[in-house]
Amino acid sequence: MATVSTNEFKGGLKLMLDNEPCVILENEYVKPGKGQAFNRVKIRKLLSGKVLEKTFKSGDTCEVADVMDIDLDYLYSDGEFYHFMNNETFEQIAADAKAVGENAKWLVENNTCMITLWNGNPITVTPPNFVELEVTDTDPGLKGDTQGTGGKPATLATGAVVRVPLFIAIGEVIKVDTRTGEYVGRVK
């Protein structure tokens, strides 16, 4: 297996720790006044989603995770699995609810998602950064009702609930940032 030195650690690098693929979220190189230098690393386990901090001595090596990120189009969900297709080979891959997780509310048919495969099985599904969804339910925005935050909750076509400005009405299509779950703007 390929190995990587702690000197080459950076955000996004995928490693094997305790026989489980992990991704580095943050890496901080620390050189104390006395003693050996080390890397303080924040890691997210790809299978369980747990975030933990580990320290590595400077110069140590770690095994690189044998994972593959591929872009696939979301097709549909049959209740148990979410089905994706490769546009070039037309090969279909089914991901379970554990791999999709909280991102299920951002999946829109025919949108391209990034799937992380480990041993040929999908372990994480990352939706596009921005999705366009129709508002299916929200309170009517009354004129002069601007006290407080100036926002209201809106239910989208996928079931996600997002805070939107008062002028958004049922049936409008809005753009949402899937990383934060925040309203970005109206789609014209």
Swiss-Prot record:
Residue list for modification N6-(3,6-diaminohexanoyl)-5-hydroxylysine: 34
Q: In which pathway does it act?
A: Protein biosynthesis; polypeptide chain elongation
Q: Which GO terms describe its molecular function?
A: translation elongation factor activity
State any GO CC term: cytoplasm
Q: Which PROSITE patterns match?
A: EFP
Query: What gene name is listed for this protein?
Result: efp
| Location of the protein in the cell | Cytoplasm
* Family according to the record: Belongs to the elongation factor P family.
Enumerate the Gene Ontology biological process terms: peptide biosynthetic process
List the SMART domains: EFP, Elong-fact-P_C
Q: Which organism is it from?
A: Vibrio parahaemolyticus serotype O3:K6 (strain RIMD 2210633)
Instruction: Tell me where it mainly resides.
Output: cytoplasm
Q: How is it modified after translation?
A: May be beta-lysylated on the epsilon-amino group of Lys-34 by the combined action of EpmA and EpmB, and then hydroxylated on the C5 position of the same residue by EpmC (if this protein is present). Lysylation is critical for the stimulatory effect of EF-P on peptide-bond formation. The lysylation moiety may extend toward the peptidyltransferase center and stabilize the terminal 3-CCA end of the tRNA. Hydroxylation of the C5 position on Lys-34 may allow additional potential stabilizing hydrogen-bond interactions with the P-tRNA.
The alphabetical list of record keywords is:
Cytoplasm, Elongation factor, Hydroxylation, Protein biosynthesis
Biological function? Involved in peptide bond synthesis. Alleviates ribosome stalling that occurs when 3 or more consecutive Pro residues or the sequence PPG is present in a protein, possibly by augmenting the peptidyl transferase activity of the ribosome. Modification of Lys-34 is required for alleviation.
The protein here is known as: Elongation factor P
